[in-house]
Amino acid sequence: MRRMLLHLSVLTLSCVWATAMEIPMSTVVKETLTQLSAHRALLTSNETMRLPVPTHKNHQLCIGEIFQGLDILKNQTVRGGTVEMLFQNLSLIKKYIDRQKEKCGEERRRTRQFLDYLQEFLGVMSTEWAMEG
């Protein structure tokens, strides 16, 4: 029990340290991809578990579903060890995305500014989104 508490304390401190040190999110994402590959066998050991998998190919539109599946996976996975750091990193990524979404709040601007934003949005959509049919 002491060992587990010590381990959780270390994980908590590392999470606080990562946030305080403002580790670039790109570094956290790369580390998380590596951890995901390393723990894939453990995470897929429960073949009866069913998780929501978006059919849409534009991942940025399905963030809610992705994190809903992640919560289910987290609750059904044996905790502890290095897999705990994977879930810590995924939690940091979710918090980052939530903070970015807060910037979507509406602000009243002139028509020209709105059209500039719309044009930029459509440009991203035409080059970075997988278009269906």
UniProtKB/Swiss-Prot annotation:
A GO molecular-function descriptor: interleukin-5 receptor binding
Pfam family, one: IL5
GO BP annotation list: immune response; interleukin-5-mediated signaling pathway; positive regulation of B cell proliferation; positive regulation of DNA-binding transcription factor activity; positive regulation of DNA-templated transcription; positive regulation of eosinophil differentiation; positive regulation of immunoglobulin production; positive regulation of podosome assembly
Disruption phenotype: In IL-5 deletion mice, the intestinal eosinophilia that developed in WT mice during T.spiralis infection was completely abolished, revealing the importance of IL5 for the increased production and recruitment of eosinophils to the gut during infection.
Localization per record: Secreted
Cytoplasm recorded as keyword: no
Glycosylation sites: N46, N75, N89
Tissue: Expressed in lymphoid cells, including spleen, thymus, lymph nodes and peripheral blood mononuclear cells.
Signal peptide extent: 1-20
Keyword vocabulary terms for this entry: Cytokine, Disulfide bond, Glycoprotein, Growth factor, Secreted, Signal
Cellular component GO terms, alphabetical: extracellular space
InterPro entries: 4_helix_cytokine-like_core (IPR009079), IL-5 (IPR000186)
Assembly, per entry: Homodimer; disulfide-linked. Interacts with IL5RA. Interacts with CSF2RB.
Family assignment from sequence similarity: Belongs to the IL-5 family.
Primary role: Homodimeric cytokine expressed predominantly by T-lymphocytes and NK cells that plays an important role in the survival, differentiation, and chemotaxis of eosinophils. Also acts on activated and resting B-cells to induce immunoglobulin production, growth, and differentiation. Mechanistically, exerts its biological effects through a receptor composed of IL5RA subunit and the cytokine receptor common subunit beta/CSF2RB.
Protein name as annotated: Interleukin-5
Provenance organism: Mus musculus
